[in-house]
């Protein structure tokens, strides 16, 4: 089944990883103190931006990749009760290889 949203140009739709709820020592982190995660899973990838000659620049990620992205990159969107992040390829920092 394909994802119901199709990103444009060099945009990527990411499902953010869950924020940590507990510290390594076992302390519970309240919701208002949780930091937004900077990683998630790629759900959909746009076709890529066009270069000066009009050719598509291939994307570096694919659906299913786990990625790290910049702290202030992307736009949070809500669609059908779910929260997603739409980021530009330029806001991606790395693919997680585990």
UniProtKB/Swiss-Prot annotation:
GO terms for molecular function: ATP binding; metal ion binding; protein folding chaperone; protein-folding chaperone binding; unfolded protein binding. Signal peptide: none annotated. GO terms for cellular component: cytoplasm. Its main location: cytoplasm. Gene3D superfamilies: GroES chaperonin. Disulfide bonds: none annotated. This is Co-chaperonin GroES. It comes from Bifidobacterium animalis subsp. lactis (strain AD011).
